[in-house]
């Protein structure tokens, strides 16, 4: 579960290393975001020469959360870290590579480009 002020690792090659959630999209009173949800975030740490700079405001989709999520078949999925992938305005990933596994929930939310780039879908 990601909320305002949550810090996430960036799981792509845009140049950002860490982002901070400033808004959860999807309704005026929405407080938490899980795997497959879109957030507005600011870049807190970035490498020199990357596509994004520290202080940039970006949209990102969450691909891994520490808080477990119940699946319809009764199983649970959780990861060791909170991570997100930075998006363009049309919903495609801004980077060209994805690092680490991503949740299967992204397929249901129609993030097929991220699914195809990811090395593993859990």
Curated annotation (Swiss-Prot):
Part of the 50S ribosomal subunit. Forms a cluster with proteins L3 and L19. In the 70S ribosome, L14 and L19 interact and together make contacts with the 16S rRNA in bridges B5 and B8. Keywords: Ribonucleoprotein, Ribosomal protein, RNA-binding, rRNA-binding. This is Large ribosomal subunit protein uL14. It comes from Streptomyces avermitilis (strain ATCC 31267 / DSM 46492 / JCM 5070 / NBRC 14893 / NCIMB 12804 / NRRL 8165 / MA-4680). Binds to 23S rRNA. Forms part of two intersubunit bridges in the 70S ribosome. One of its GO terms (molecular function) is large ribosomal subunit rRNA binding. PANTHER family: 50S/60S RIBOSOMAL PROTEIN L14/L23, LARGE RIBOSOMAL SUBUNIT PROTEIN UL14M. The keyword Chloroplast does not apply. Belongs to the universal ribosomal protein uL14 family. Coiled coil: none annotated. GO terms for cellular component: cytosolic large ribosomal subunit.
